[in-house]
């Protein structure tokens, strides 16, 4: 989780069977901090944001299409969602981050990197291609974090230019 406008960042890795811990952790932060998940699996439990060398492999191609600054927010959100829905092949999952939209194409099989930055760069090229085709945000890195659906996107002062109020991230 990240505190808007700076402050402490908290990173936790939860395992299957820790649903009570997850709920407690989320409730402590909901509406006060932005809560994220890593798109791709890590090699070990993390206590800080993972780097490329911490990523085990790619399980999804991803993209983030945000409204363009200076344009009408609702028209831009409609544009972003339309771009994703009309893209071929269609994303497996579309998340409304509360600002823009994130598209995920789940792979049939994880493409392993085992922390190799060279292999990560090869796989990031797929994200970059989708990013270019959709005129999306620069977020093609394999260690990317994205807003967790079901949590509130809390914009800080800088983000309020694009997202004037809090918004719930949804699938």
Which residue stretches match the model-derived regions?
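Short, structured patches in soluble enzyme cores that scaffold and shape functional sites
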Residues: 105-109, 149-150
């Amino acid at each position: 989780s990240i505190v808007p406008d700076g402050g402490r960042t908290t990173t936790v890795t939860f395992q299957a069977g820790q649903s009570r811990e997850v709920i407690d952790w989320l409730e402590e932060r909901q509406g006060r901090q932005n809560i994220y998940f890593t798109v791709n699996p890590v090699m070990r439990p993390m206590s800080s944001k993972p780097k490329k060398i911490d990523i085990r492999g790619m399980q999804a191609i991803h993209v983030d299409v945000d409204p363009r600054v200076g344009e009408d927010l609702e028209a831009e959100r409609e544009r972003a969602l339309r771009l994703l829905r009309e893209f071929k092949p269609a994303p497996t999952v579309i998340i409304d981050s509360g600002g823009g939209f994130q598209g995920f194409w789940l792979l049939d099989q994880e493409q392993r990197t085992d922390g190799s930055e060279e292999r990560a760069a090869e796989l990031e090229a797929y994200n970059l291609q989708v990013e270019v085709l959709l005129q999306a945000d620069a977020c093609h890195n394999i260690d990317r974090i994205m807003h967790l659906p079901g949590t509130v996107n809390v914009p800080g002062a800088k983000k309020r230019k694009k997202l004037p109020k809090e918004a719930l991230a949804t699938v």
